[in-house]
Amino acid sequence: MKISIYATLAALSLALPAVAQEGDAAKGEKEFNKCKACHMVQAPDGTDIVKGGKTGPNLYGVVGRKIASVEGFKYGDGILEVAEKNPDMVWSEADLIEYVTDPKPWLVEKTGDSAAKTKMTFKLGKNQADVVAFLAQHSPDAGAEAAPAEGAAN
């Protein structure tokens, strides 16, 4: 009996990081105020969900969308390199959380290039999962947030 209790506790402790990443979309909507200086969330029909800047790409539909794929947006070299090396990679909630926490290390990891640069200098120090949960609400392809296609490198 003791062994099964310990095994259950061990299994639960391994699941905690996954649970801890789940965000609160309502809190994320408020937290997104920090992001709207550069980003907007605008539906394809032109409806503004969050009016914001155009320095960064429109984040409507970002979860489940291919990396660096907003038509007409001028991306930086680092994120373009990620897209080039991982052509089938889409933004997952986990990748977005990691990226908004500190874009530079994420780019270095995904490109393998320690000199990779980002145009996004802002780092979201807390509530990342909440912001990503908010963005996922406005991402019709969020359920398609599949793992990278076979042969695609992370």
UniProtKB/Swiss-Prot annotation:
Keywords: Electron transport, Heme, Iron, Metal-binding, Pyrrolidone carboxylic acid, Signal, Transport
PTM field: Binds 1 heme c group covalently per subunit.
Residue positions binding heme c: 35, 38-39, 120
Gene: cyc
InterPro entries reported in the protein's UniProt record: Cyt_c-like_dom, Cyt_c-like_dom_sf, Cyt_c_1A/1B
Protein's name in the database: Cytochrome c-550
PANTHER family registered for this protein in UniProt: CYTOCHROME C
Domain of life: Bacteria
PROSITE patterns: CYTC (PS51007)
Any one GO molecular-function label of the UniProt entry: electron transfer activity
Database matches in Gene3D superfamilies: Cytochrome c-like domain (1.10.760.10)
Signal peptide region: 1-20
